[in-house]
Design a protein with these regions (language model features):
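Active-site nucleophile and cofactor-binding loops and adjacent substrate-binding regions
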Residues: 12-18, 42-45, 148, 153
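Active-site C-terminal subdomain of aminotransferase-like
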Residues: 149-187
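Catalytic PLP-binding core of fold-type I/II PLP enzymes
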Residues: 102-141
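Short loop-beta-helix segment that forms the pyridoxal 5′-phosphate
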Residues: 2-23
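Generic beta-strand/beta-sheet core signal
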Residues: 42, 67-69, 91-96, 118-123, ...
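PLP-dependent aminotransferase-class I/II
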Residues: 15, 41-101, 107
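Catalytic cores of nucleotide-enabled group-transfer and carboxylate-activating enzymes in metabolic
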Residues: 20-27, 34, 38-42, 54, ...
Length: 187
């Protein structure tokens, strides 16, 4: 997953892609210690992902989830650029989007980072064999559904949500991390 997304760290998976997407919002909320409570979601994000994010945060009165009402040209993300501000914790896009379109995310990444917000890219892992990686666009987190990697469907499942991020976010990352390291003695 790290090779496909260009990220430094990946966890040992979530229940599904929508759960991984919602966990990215949890990470962003903790990253800003609850001071930034605005989530900007592209209207071309998968509706199940959007609904899972809303379900995760339905008990929070002060979380603002915006982006549904924004129209315009997907190719430029200009309308999303206008609603990213200093209260924004996270900017969420899907790549390719829910309609299968491929957009240049460079301007959106620059705007998100100019406002110190995190950029999350929900992606199809198969498409990343041909497209630029989320890290190439400057994404802080990449997540999505791992089922397209060859998991056969059986009575509505199984699915797995992948979640990868930059090294700076590893301490706030949900899930198990599996890896190899050295102990205090260097062994």
């Amino acid at each position: 997953i790290c090779s496909l997304t260009g990220m430094a760290v990946s966890n040992a998976s979530h229940y599904d892609g929508a759960t991984a997407a919602a966990e990215a919002c949890v990470l962003a909320l903790h990253n800003f210690r609850g001071k930034r409570k605005k989530f900007v979601l592209s209207r071309y994000l998968h509706p199940h992902y959007r609904q899972t994010i809303k379900t995760y945060f339905q008990g929070y009165d002060d979380i603002i989830i915006t982006g549904d009402e924004v129209g315009g040209d997907l190719q430029s993300h200009e309308d999303l650029l206008d609603i990213v501000d200093t209260d924004t914790a996270i900017v969420y896009v899907q790549y390719p989007d829910f309609l299968g379109r491929i957009a240049d995310l460079t301007a959106l990444a620059e705007t998100a980072h100019a406002h110190k917000a995190l950029l999350v890219v929900v992606c199809n892992p198969i498409s990343l064999g041909m497209l630029k990686t989320p890290a190439d666009y400057g994404a802080d987190i990449a997540c999505g559904e791992g089922q397209p990697l060859g998991i056969p469907l059986n009575f509505g499942g199984p699915y797995l949500g992948f979640f990868a991020c930059k090294q700076e976010q590893v301490r706030r990352m949900a899930g198990r991390l599996v890896g190899q390291t050295l102990d205090a003695r260097g062994e």
